[in-house]
Amino acid sequence: MEQFQIVNFYEFKQLVDVTPLPEVKERLKELMIETGVRGTIILAEEGYNASLCGTSDEMSAFLLAAAKILDTEFDPKVSLHNERPLRKIDVKIKPEIVTLKQPVDISLGAGTHVKPEQWNEIISDEETFVLDTRNDYEFKNGTFRGAVNPETEKFSDLPAYIAENLDPAKHKRVAMFCTGGIRCEKFAPYMKGLGFDEIYQLEGGILRYIETVPKEDSLWDGECFVFDERRTLTHDLVQGIEPDHSLRNPKRYNR
């Protein structure tokens, strides 16, 4: 039985410097139809964010052509599944590729990227505030040992939590993580703008960690919620047990 690749990738770059967004949208949608790839691509002036699936041949053809359209080189995260967990063709233009609803100076740069192999050392330090930037229903399916749950319903709630609970003078070292890295890539410069200087973020997100770090060495407890029909993943990116649906937003998947 042929397996399907689930491929996620994103990049913060000025897409309007490449091609007008409506044209990019149409070209990518046509490419999805042509190659048979399914999933969602979000476009904004600040960049792109994609979650796609297809056979190995379909994905190879799509990524080769899409890289030319977007004038980039992809660094995708890839996992496998026996069925297509994504079934629609959807290319959207939005104000943001991940919705924070706050001004962010991306030029401040991301935090220090920590490879999965070094992540345990960072979050085991008592001086480190370990921040799960995901939502409450994601946290309850699984998180890193010692991580703090901001109890947010959506990503745009996180700035209010920071304003009420963190102080740059007291919380000098913050290590943050999310599913695949995109939320941290945006939130790290936001926190730098607030005066937090020592920011660390998990390179490749939880997905790369549970793919890379052996279970016996892992500080990850539970399963990782994902935004497709698989629902959750465990170590080695294996589909987890169907979660309690009360742990997620019943109306929509907020990121």
Segments from the language model and where they lie:
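Rhodanese-like catalytic fold shared by cysteine-dependent sulfurtransferases
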Residues: 2-111, 128, 134-174, 182-255
